[in-house]
């Protein structure tokens, strides 16, 4: 039986790109289905820095989604002489965001409870490469409740009665939720589940978070972007750069460096990455190309500067 590496060796770059673009189209349809309430949760697996977050943000904004951010809002305590109870606080400035509420690695269980409560009647919560939350028992239980296939999804979090931040926001210990949830991850959940199930046959107990992941995939949708090798990541990045003119019509480069790359410089950048990908200090992603482009614009001897900055 051929390994994944052996199979990839038989494919052209165009073959690989077709596979990745088919997966990307599935993601686009999955995000829309999640927004519409047909898929819960949507799990998208892919490497960091290839545009997963941007796609979710753009699609949820285009759909007119408005999400509420209690954590980013301003709150003030009641006047001690007013006779009012200590909680909840008064919200001086309620923050809402266009599109999904994007939550990264610096995230805790109480924050998840706050986000679910703030968006219990709508909005989209997107957990963005937040592996710790996906393994946390309490957070997993909240997400399990929030993704049940039923019209009314009751959430229970008893610590809401004793957590200062949740008391401040007025988060109840029990509430119903109707929130679309998207999970972006570079964890290969399906492979981890396969390994755990095999070990279970040999007598090794399955970890709790693996069982929850199985439930998430069963009730929702799991999409692998098929960027599972350095070559497939490079092929997709090159396609993205060319299709959206990421380096030749770049608002980012024009703001930070005064101009974008010329077409000739763009070709040189792609060639340099191809020749040096195996020597990069960090895994290749779209940000790598922006870093290289910035060096090319700012340094006369850019090849030497790029070697020092980007290669190991």
What does each model-found stretch correspond to?
Residues 36-56:
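Walker A/P-loop nucleotide-binding motif
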Residues 128-130:
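Walker B catalytic acidic pair
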Residues 233-309:
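Conserved AAA+ ATPase small/helical "lid" subdomain
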Residues 121-125, 175-182:
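Loop/turn-to-beta-strand initiation segments
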Residues 2-35:
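N-terminal pre-Walker A segment at the start of P-loop NTPase domains
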């Amino acid at each position: 039986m051929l390994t994944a590496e052996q199979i990839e060796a038989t494919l052209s770059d165009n073959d690989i790109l077709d596979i990745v673009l088919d997966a990307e189209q599935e993601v686009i349809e999955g995000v829309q289905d999640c927004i519409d309430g047909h898929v819960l949760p949507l799990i998208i697996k892919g490497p960091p820095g290839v545009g997963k977050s941007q796609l979710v943000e753009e699609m949820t904004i285009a759909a007119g989604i408005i999400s509420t951010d209690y954590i980013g809002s301003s709150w003030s305590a009641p006047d001690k002489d007013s006779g009012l109870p200590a909680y909840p606080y008064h919200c001086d400035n309620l923050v809402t965001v266009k599109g999904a509420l994007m939550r990264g690695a610096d995230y805790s269980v109480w924050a998840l409870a706050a986000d679910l409560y703030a968006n219990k009647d709508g909005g989209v919560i997107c957990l963005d490469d937040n592996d710790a939350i996906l393994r946390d028992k309490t957070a997993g239980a909240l997400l399990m409740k929030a993704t049940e296939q039923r019209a009314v999804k009751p959430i229970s979090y008893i610590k809401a009665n004793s957590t200062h931040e949740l008391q401040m926001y007025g988060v109840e210990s029990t509430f119903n939720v109707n929130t679309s949830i998207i999970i972006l991850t570079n964890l290969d959940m399906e492979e981890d589940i396969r390994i755990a199930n095999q070990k279970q046959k040999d007598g090794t107990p399955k970890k709790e978070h693996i069982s929850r992941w199985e439930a998430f995939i069963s009730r929702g949708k799991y999409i692998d972007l098929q960027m599972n090798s350095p070559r497939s990541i490079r092929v997709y990045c090159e396609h993205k750069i060319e299709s959206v003119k990421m380096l030749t019509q770049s608002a980012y480069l024009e703001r930070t460096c005064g101009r974008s790359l010329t077409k000739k410089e763009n070709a040189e950048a792609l060639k340099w990455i191809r020749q040096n990908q195996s020597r990069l200090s960090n895994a290749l992603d779209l940000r790598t190309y922006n870093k290289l482009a910035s060096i090319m614009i700012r340094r006369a001897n850019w090849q030497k500067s790029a070697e020092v900055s980007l290669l190991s």
